[in-house]
C-alpha cells in the first residue's frame, strides 16, 4: 500500500502533525505510520551556491572580477544540516511513497524551503499542499481534509525563487564591489540600504531643526483651567511673546464670561486585531522588546505552546471561515485575568463586523488571534506571557462595546479675547474594561463642573505659558517598523503609482523579514542604540555616501515588490524579472568602480587584533561594546562590555558587564561597581531569603483576583505549609 510523505519546516511542527496522523514509529529524523511518513527540514536545507561554485576565481574578492552573473543558478545542500537533508531525501525517494504533502510554513518563504529540497532530491512525484494558520490538532485535521494541489502554488514558488536570486545578484555584487573598492566590510541590499537611508534622513531633519520659543496664556478660575485661543487661527500658541504680554496687561482684573457650553457624546472603537508589525510595535513601546525578540517569542507561542496563530501575517482581519471557530477560541482564553470578559461574551451572541472580518483583506494568513487551545499560563515565560496578554486583550476587545464618553467644550470671553476649556466624563468603559488603567494613555481632560451659558467668573488669575518647538524624535524600533511599513514620506518625487504599490505590498521588506533587516543593521554595525533611540554609526553614514543613489530609495524596492507580486499572481515571468536584476547589478558595479570617494575608519583603536595583529575597531553592538578586526577576511570579534538585565541596587538602571573570566565586573553609570562573583553570591542569598515571602505574595495576588488562575504552580503553592 502506497504512502504519503509529509514535509514540515521544523521538527516541532513535524511531530505535531505525526501525532495527529497516528505516526508513532520512530525513525532517525522522521516518524512513520500506516498511511503517512512525516519528516522535517530545519529551516532551509538547500540554498543558493556561493560565487566560487561558478568559478574558482570568485573565492578571492577582486573588484576586476565583478559583476558576477551566473547563467543558471546552482543550489547546494547546507553543510551543517546535510544529515537531515539526506534523511528527507531518502523518505521522498522511497518506492512505497506515491505523493508528497508540503507542510512547511504557509507563505512565500515556506514554499521555497520545501520546493528547493524536493528539486535537489530529484524526486518527481505529485504534490499536495497543507495550508494552515495554526498547528493545533483541530487545525491540522481540518487542513488534511482540504489539501490543495501543489501546482496551485507554482507561481508563489516562482516569486520566492525570483526574490532569492535577485537578492543574490544585487546583494553579492554590490557588497563585493563596495568592500573591495574601499577595503572595509560594507554590505548593502534592496531593503537594508533604503532603511538605513530613512534613518539618515531623520537624523538630518533633527540636525537641521531650529527650535523656536512659543508662548500662550492660561486663565485660572476657581475650578477650571481656560486656555487662550487666537480668534482667527484658533491656535493656542503664538511665537510673539510681546502679544501675550500685551494681552496680560489688557485683560488684567477683567471678568470671564461663558458664552457657549457644548456637550457631545463620543465613541472610540477597539483597535484592529494584530498583524506581526503592529504587534512588534506595541511590544517595543510597552516592554522595549526588539522586533526580533517579539517574532521569536511569537514563534514559540505558535509552535511550542500552540496558543496563538501563525505569526508572520500582514493582515489585521479574519476570513469568514474563522467566524465559526470564535466561540471555541473565547472558551480557550476564559482563564485567569480574561475569564470574566470572555465568559460575558460567551453568554450573548458573538457579533462580528467588517472592522475585523473581511475576506478581501486576508491573503495568505488572517490576523494573529488565540487558537482553540487553552494555555497553562504558568508554563509561559515572562516574555511569552506579555505577548500572549497583548494578543488576547486585543482579540477580546474587538467583540466588546465602544468606549463612550461625553466631551464638554466651554467657550468664554475676556474682553474681546477667546478662551476655551475642555473636559470629559466617561459614560461607558466598553472595550477599555479589559485594559488596566495604567495601560491607557491619558489625554489630560478632567471632568468639568456644571456651569451655564452666561455665567460670569471673576478673580481670574492669568499665567503666561511658554515652550519650545521640538525636533522629530529619533527612530526607535517601533517607529522604524512603522516607517518601513509606510516609507512614502521618505521618497523624493515618487510617482503616485509607486507610492500605491509600496502601500499594497507592505512597504520595505515583509512582516517576516523586517526584524531580520533591523537585526542585520545592528550586527553589521551600521546602526547603534543609545537608550531606545537608533543612531547611524560612522560606518553606516559613509556607506550611504558610497552606495549607488538608486539603491538608497524605497522606490526601487517598491517596484521590485510589485514585480514579485505579479510573478506570484502569474502576471510576470520569473526569468524576465531576474534578467532585469542582472542589468541592474552590472550598472551598480560600474558606478562603484568609477567612484572617486574614499572610506575612513573613524573608530580605530590602539588594540591589536589577537589573530592578525592589525588595529581593531571600537563598535557599539546591540547588546554592548565590542572590538572588531578591520580586516574583513580576519573578522575577529571581542566583547568589551555587555548590557545585562541585572539592575543596579542603587539607581535600578541596567548594569554593564565588563572584563573577562573571573575578573568580570558589573558597573553602572551612577558609579556602582561589583564583581560578578560577589553579585552571584548576593543574588543567591537573596533568593534563599525571599522564597517564603515570594510564595506568600503570590498567593495574596491570586486571592485578590478572586478567580482561579489556570496554573499548576498556583495549586502546588496553595498546599504548602509555610
Predicted segments — roles?
Residues 305-306, 525:
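Glycine-centered, phosphate/nucleic-acid-interacting loop/turn motifs that mediate DNA/RNA or nucleotide
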Amino acid at each position: 500500500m502506497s504512502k504519503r510523505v509529509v514535509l514540515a519546516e521544523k521538527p516541532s511542527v513535524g511531530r505535531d502533525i505525526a501525532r495527529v496522523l497516528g505516526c508513532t514509529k520512530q525513525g532517525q529524523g522522521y516518524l512513520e505510520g500506516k498511511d503517512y511518513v512525516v519528516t522535517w527540514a530545519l529551516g532551509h536545507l538547500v540554498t543558493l551556491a556561493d560565487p566560487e561554485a561558478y568559478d574558482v576565481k570568485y573565492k578571492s574578492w577582486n573588484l576586476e572580477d565583478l559583476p558576477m552573473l551566473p547563467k543558471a543558478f546552482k543550489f547546494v545542500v547546507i553543510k551543517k544540516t546535510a544529515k537531515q537533508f539526506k534523511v528527507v531525501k531518502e523518505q521522498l525517494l522511497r518506492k512505497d511513497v506515491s505523493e508528497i504533502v508540503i507542510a512547511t510554513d504557509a507563505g512565500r518563504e515556506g514554499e521555497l524551503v520545501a520546493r528547493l529540497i524536493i528539486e535537489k532530491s530529484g524526486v518527481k512525484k505529485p504534490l499536495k499542499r497543507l495550508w494552515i494558520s495554526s498547528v493545533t490538532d483541530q487545525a491540522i485535521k481540518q487542513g488534511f481534509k482540504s489539501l490543495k494541489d501543489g501546482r496551485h502554488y507554482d507561481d508563489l514558488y516562482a516569486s520566492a525563487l525570483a526574490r532569492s536570486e535577485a537578492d543574490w545578484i544585487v546583494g553579492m555584487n554590490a557588497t563585493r564591489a563596495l568592500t573591495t573598492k574601499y577595503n572595509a566590510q560594507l554590505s548593502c541590499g534592496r531593503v537594508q540600504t533604503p532603511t538605513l537611508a530613512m534613518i539618515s534622513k531623520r537624523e538630518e531633519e533633527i540636525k537641521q531643526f531650529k527650535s523656536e520659543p512659543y508662548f500662550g496664556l492660561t486663565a485660572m478660575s476657581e475650578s477650571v483651567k481656560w486656555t487662550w485661543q487666537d480668534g482667527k487661527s484658533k491656535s493656542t500658541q503664538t511665537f510673539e511673546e510681546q502679544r501675550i504680554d500685551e494681552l496680560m496687561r489688557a485683560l488684567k482684573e477683567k471678568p470671564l464670561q461663558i458664552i457657549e457650553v457644548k456637550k457631545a457624546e463620543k465613541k472610540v472603537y477597539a483597535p484592529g486585531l494584530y498583524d506581526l508589525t503592529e504587534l512588534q510595535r506595541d511590544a517595543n513601546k510597552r516592554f522595549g522588546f526588539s522586533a526580533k525578540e517579539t517574532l521569536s517569542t511569537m514563534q514559540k507561542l505558535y509552535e511550542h505552546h500552540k496558543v496563538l496563530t501563525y505569526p508572520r501575517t500582514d493582515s489585521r482581519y479574519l476570513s469568514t471561515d474563522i467566524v465559526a471557530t470564535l466561540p471555541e477560541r473565547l472558551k480557550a482564553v476564559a482563564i485567569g485575568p480574561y475569564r470574566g470578559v470572555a465568559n460575558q461574551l460567551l453568554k450573548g451572541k458573538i457579533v462580528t463586523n467588517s472592522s475585523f472580518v473581511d475576506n478581501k483583506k486576508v491573503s495568505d494568513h488572517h490576523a494573529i488571534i488565540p487558537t482553540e487551545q487553552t494555555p497553562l499560563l504558568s508554563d509561559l515565560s515572562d516574555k511569552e506571557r506579555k505577548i500572549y496578554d497583548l494578543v488576547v486583550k486585543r482579540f477580546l476587545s474587538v467583540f466588546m462595546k465602544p468606549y463612550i464618553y461625553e466631551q464638554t467644550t466651554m467657550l468664554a470671553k475676556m474682553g474681546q479675547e477667546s478662551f476655551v476649556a475642555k473636559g470629559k466624563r466617561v459614560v461607558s468603559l466598553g472595550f477599555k474594561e479589559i485594559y488596566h488603567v495604567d495601560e491607557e494613555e491619558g489625554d489630560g481632560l478632567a471632568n468639568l463642573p456644571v456651569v451655564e451659558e452666561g455665567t460670569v467668573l471673576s478673580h481670574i488669575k492669568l499665567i503666561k505659558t511658554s515652550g519650545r518647538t521640538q525636533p522629530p524624535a529619533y527612530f526607535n524600533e517601533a517607529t522604524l517598523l512603522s516607517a518601513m511599513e509606510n516609507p512614502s514620506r521618505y521618497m523624493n518625487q515618487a510617482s503616485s503609482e509607486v507610492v500605491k504599490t509600496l502601500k499594497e505590498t507592505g512597504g520595505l521588506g515583509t512582516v517576516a523579514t523586517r526584524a531580520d533587516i533591523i537585526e542585520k543593521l545592528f550586527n553589521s554595525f551600521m546602526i547603534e542604540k543609545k537608550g531606545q533611540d537608533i543612531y547611524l554609526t560612522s560606518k553606516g553614514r559613509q556607506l550611504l555616501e558610497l552606495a549607488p543613489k538608486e539603491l538608497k530609495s524605497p522606490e526601487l524596492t517598491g517596484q521590485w515588490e510589485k514585480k514579485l507580486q505579479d510573478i506570484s499572481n502569474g502576471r510576470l515571468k520569473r526569468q524576465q524579472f531576474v534578467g532585469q536584476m542582472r542589468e541592474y547589478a552590472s550598472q551598480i558595479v560600474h558606478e562603484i568602480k568609477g567612484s572617486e570617494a574614499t572610506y575612513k575608519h573613524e573608530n580605530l583603536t590602539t588594540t591589536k587584533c589577537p589573530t592578525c595583529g592589525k588595529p581593531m575597531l571600537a563598535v557599539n553592538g546591540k547588546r554592548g561594546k565590542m572590538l572588531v578586526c578591520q580586516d574583513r577576511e580576519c573578522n575577529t570579534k571581542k566583547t568589551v562590555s555587555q548590557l545585562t538585565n541585572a539592575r543596579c541596587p542603587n539607581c535600578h538602571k541596567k548594569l554593564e558587564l565588563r572584563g573577562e573570566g573571573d575578573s568580570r565586573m558589573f558597573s553602572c553609570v551612577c558609579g556602582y561597581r561589583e564583581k560578578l562573583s560577589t553579585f552571584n553570591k548576593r543574588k543567591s542569598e537573596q533568593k534563599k531569603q525571599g522564597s517564603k515571602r515570594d510564595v506568600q505574595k503570590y498567593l495574596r495576588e491570586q486571592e485578590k483576583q478572586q478567580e482561579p488562575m489556570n496554573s499548576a504552580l498556583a495549586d502546588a503553592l496553595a498546599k504548602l505549609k509555610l
